[in-house]
Amino acid sequence: MTFRNGGRLMRGRGGRRKVCEFSRLGILPDYKDPERLRRFLGPTGKILPRRRTGLTAKMQRRLTIAIKRARHMALLPFVERSVTDRRR
């Protein structure tokens, strides 16, 4: 797909739109399911943004709350171990 941008032709990024995994499965993000929550964490343990996860805004907010609860209950780490090992 090409389109004009200030007189220049730009090639857009093709691809399929991501579908919200939680809406597709009909479930809600739950802090008691750390394996499912880990898929939404980056390699350093940070929560991935919506544009990477493909979640709706509502589900992204619920996911964030579920991840934070799981971290406080020690079901998920705040920081991945590989990051802390590099500093030593």
UniProtKB/Swiss-Prot annotation:
Pfam families: Ribosomal_S18 (PF01084). GO terms for cellular component: cytosolic small ribosomal subunit. Transmembrane segments: none annotated. GO terms for biological process: translation. Keywords: Ribonucleoprotein, Ribosomal protein, RNA-binding, rRNA-binding. The keyword rRNA-binding applies. One of its GO terms (molecular function) is structural constituent of ribosome. InterPro entries: Ribosomal_bS18, Ribosomal_bS18_CS, Ribosomal_bS18_sf. Gene3D superfamilies: Ribosomal protein S18. Binds as a heterodimer with protein bS6 to the central domain of the 16S rRNA, where it helps stabilize the platform of the 30S subunit. Belongs to the bacterial ribosomal protein bS18 family. Part of the 30S ribosomal subunit. Forms a tight heterodimer with protein bS6. This is Small ribosomal subunit protein bS18B. It comes from Roseiflexus castenholzii (strain DSM 13941 / HLO8).
